[in-house]
Amino acid sequence: MTTIEVRGLTKQYGSDLVVDDLSFSVEPGQVTGFLGPNGAGKSTTMKMILGLAAPTRGSVTVGGRSYRDLPVPLTEVGALLDAGAVHGARTAYNHLLALAVSNGLPRRRVGEVLGRTGLDAVAGRPAGRFSLGMRQRLGIAATLLGDPRILIFDEPVNGLDPEGIRWIRDFMRELAAEGRAVLVSSHLMSEMAQTADHLVVIGRGRLMADTGIAELMHATGNGTVLVRTADPGSFAYHLTAAGGTVRDGLEGSLVISGLSGVEIGKLAAYHGVPLSELTPQRASLEDAFMELTKDSVEYQGVAA
């Protein structure tokens, strides 16, 4: 069952078109990465999913209903948009208790989510004394109070140290393994490559990709082949003549694009060129993202 359904979603502020006819779905049992350059419309889309902003056109449903029609929203969807949105003088326990009581949730859930996020030992400490990583955990604990099947996180690893990033990555994967739908935005491509099962990429408010990570990297190309040979100059000539693009790599190697590893190997055999290395270099998620969104950034540098 689809848990988040976005159809033809459009948001306009005056003459500024922030989200433009956007459609995608988020499925249970997986982490869906929500990616795009700054100003792409990610945060605005999340706000519309959560009923914090009204669409100009289109629709978005959560579990088959609009957010405002959910009788007890926290039991359907939990969201963390700003981990700093907590009273600094209030303890972690009292912060969560206030949320539970005001939403008609059992008090026992406070202790359960504190334990699950590793905050039970500091439950009596004022949130204002928490580190950034602990505040993120407190925000995640709040999203779990209603035991929802849908979870939304906006840039949850921003500013965290490697230990904090790894904890959140593993926790996202754990939540998805329980059959929950997890939608997470991030600008850290290396992190998304390790966390997400599926990607939704937008640029200037429009959908650019709705696919798996491997499929995205394959579709955008950018793969190269690293070659080492005792006679790089001569082989570079043959590679160029065959339609390849050749540039010098490290320590006398050649980096070739436009030809596959199989084609390069056959070319070397035909011309009697012995190769000491032939290694396909797969494009990274960051490479694929940059290629896909290169025409959708708000500003671009100009080479001198």
Predicted regions, residues:
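Residues that scaffold the ATP/ADP-binding catalytic core of kinase and kinase-like folds
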Residues: L70, L216, A288, L292
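Solvent-exposed beta-strand sheet faces enriched in polar/charged residues
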Residues: R7, G63, R228, T279-Q281
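C-terminal coupling/interaction segments
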Residues: S257-A304
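ABC transporter nucleotide-binding domains
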Residues: T2-V6, K11-G203, A209
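ABC transporter nucleotide-binding domain
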Residues: I168-L259
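Conserved NTP-handling cores and scaffolds of large molecular machines
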Residues: N103, T220, G243, R282, ...
